[in-house]
Amino acid sequence: AGNDAGVAALPANGRIAMSTDSFVVTPQFFPGGNIGRLAVCGTVNDVATSGANVRYLSCGFILEEGYPMDKLRQIVQTMAETAHEAGVSIITGDTKVVERGGADGVYINTAGVGEVPAGVTLSGANCRPGDAILVSGTLGDHGIAIMSQREGLAFSSDIESDAAPLNHLIADVLAAAPDTRCFRDPTRGGLASTLNEFAQ
């Protein structure tokens, strides 16, 4: 505690994968999660799609003056639980407060680092015509869960965000199918944008 940097072990001979993302979502709490779960899952998944064993995260908060402490505690607790679920450590962080009206409650940035095993070279550039595309779950749950809260929409069934760390799933797929060409965690633009990227 009290240090300016987190120190972590990395492979002596090998490659690392690193990704960073900033999370701005309204509302910050929604069915199935909150902005804290998104912040951990989003970066864990981005690093994991390289085939890396995700090890460490950093997190930075930008808080609007007057943001309720009980909500902040809930977000931080969710981040800790999600990191534990993913098997990663949050080793450093920072908090800044901006004037009232200078932010929409809370923004979170996370960065992640992982070790890429030897021989793993996953990339959308590897895709070829005729490749099979596998989808790990239903489409649109997260977006609809947030939209329903934001717009006050009611549905006949409960719709929850499916945000989850996918690093263990990716590792299992690679173990079973080591010739897998690439992985993606579709976010903005969804599956259609991802497939368009592959086609290009």
Task: Give residue spans per PLM region.
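Helix-biased detector of long, well-ordered alpha-helical tracts
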Residues: 1-200
